[in-house]
Amino acid sequence: MGSHVIDLVMLRNNFSTAEMRAIWNDEARITKQLAVEAALAQAEGELGLIPKEAAKKIAKVAKETTFDIAAIAEQVAVLKHSLMPTINALQAAAGDEGEFVHYGATTQDIVDTGTVLQLKDAYNIVLRDTQVVFEKLAKLAKHYQNVPMVGRTHGMQALPITFGYKLAIWVDEFGRHLERLHEIKERVFTGNINGAVGSYASFGPKGSEVERQTLAILDLNAPTIGWQSSRDRFSEYASVIGLISATLGKIGNEFYNLMRTEINEIEEPFSKGKIGSSTMPHKRNPAAFEGLASLTPPVLKSVALIHESMHVEHERDAMSWRQEWVALPEMNAYVSAQLAILANVLDGLQVKEAVMARNLEKQHGLLLSEKVMFEVGQKLGKQTAHHLVYECAMTSFEEERPFIDTLFEQAAIADTYARAEVEQWLDPTQYTGLCADKVDEVLAAWQTKGFLKEG
């Protein structure tokens, strides 16, 4: 039983996924650190820094032994050191060859590189699920490419768009997130094995080769120079996670608003027995949308904490280091939940096309004031037409009268245009501009880049 919301049995799946939690638990942390110790011993054995038999024994024990996490945790409390109890346990398990455990390395070498291994596993989940959401959005954008709806600016009705167009904007945004995830991989997944101050002194003249071989075994990149005091790699990863989360939160908030009773254009998936309120039986609340939107703020707080961790004193310290232990698991947990929520929502999203159509007529033609202005402006001039249409629109708005009636009270319109012609101007389905075309352009662009399959 835990005390953090990520670990609370009744709530944790709202804030994370089981798959992501498993990457950041005690067992995973120690397992990755032991993997680094095993790789270090193997590399040092191959390079002659330690006996080959000792290297084989250490690597075998590190990979195959089940260590007592509770006992290690007890020793952490006694020794006031997060890694030494693990080193001691590995040494004891390796017997006489254990004297060569952790040879030349410093704690931060092992912990940082272990964290990168954990982060790589987390990244793979984020990349996979971002791709899943991207593809689901693309499919829906194409499906609803020509479905007209109200476009809103400043929270108010503005001009007609299509639902597919709205979704295509998010498709394009997720495509850029995928590009960013692929772009940062080489920089972020870089280990660090270079000793107490990064000088390789404890490894002797083969220090750089020890690092390269150790990290090659772990399938990580080797740095040009140690990064114990340079935490920008984690900050870059965090920045991309923050961008992905911000898009996810924006979508959650947008869907939340579109599900409002007064708008009612979409609804999140509903299952029989789902309760919206303990006191109002009729409520069908946007719980998934709220959850999706609510997780962005804590992600961004974790991102900020990672950025603060770049402030490192001298060659390294533990103040900024510990902030990463808090922020990296949290941001990955929260964004994994967001991606899972949205993927599930998109699978069962109810799109109410009839309601979208009714909302297009809600202001009795005012939604097409721009169209009227440009049509009339061809004869009167755009600015003169703007003034004329503005006066008609305000009258229609304030008196709650059909826009076409107030327009035909103006001689400049009544004497020039047939009512049937103006009625055509006021058809919202005929004034969505290039919305449908843009859906195809977005999908084609990402197909060309190889992020999206054709069809």
UniProtKB/Swiss-Prot annotation:
Gene, per the UniProt record: purB
Protein name stated in the entry: N-acetyl-S-(2-succino)cysteine lyase
Active site: H154, S277
InterPro entries named in the record: AdenyloSucc_lyase_C, Fumarate_lyase_CS, Fumarate_lyase_fam, Fumarate_lyase_N, L-Aspartase-like, Pur_lyase
Pfam families: ADSL_C, Lyase_1
Note: Is able to functionally complement a B.subtilis yxeK mutant in the ability to use 2SC as a sulfur source for growth.
Amino-acid positions noted as binding fumarate in the UniProt annotation, renumbered to this chain: T106, T107, R233, S278, K283, R284, N285
Top-level EC class as recorded in UniProt: lyase
Any one GO biological process: cysteine biosynthetic process
One MF term in the entry's GO annotations: N6-(1,2-dicarboxyethyl)AMP AMP-lyase (fumarate-forming) activity
EC number(s) on file: 4.3.2.-
CDD domains given in the database record: pCLME
Keyword check for Lyase: yes
Catalysed reaction equations from the record: N-acetyl-S-(2-succino)-L-cysteine = N-acetyl-L-cysteine + fumarate
One cellular component term from this protein's GO annotations in UniProt: cytosol
Keywords: Amino-acid biosynthesis, Cysteine biosynthesis, Lyase
Pathway: Amino-acid biosynthesis; L-cysteine biosynthesis
UniProt key word Lyase: yes
Family the UniProt entry places it in: Belongs to the lyase 1 family.
Function: Catalyzes the cleavage of N-acetyl-S-(2-succino)cysteine into fumarate and N-acetylcysteine. Is involved in a S-(2-succino)cysteine (2SC) degradation pathway that allows the bacterium to recover cysteine from 2SC and to detoxify 2SC that may be a toxic metabolite. Can also perform the reverse reaction in vitro, and has minor activity against 2SC and other small molecule thiols.
Top-rank taxon, per record: Bacteria
Origin organism lineage: Bacteria, Bacillati, Bacillota, Bacilli, Lactobacillales
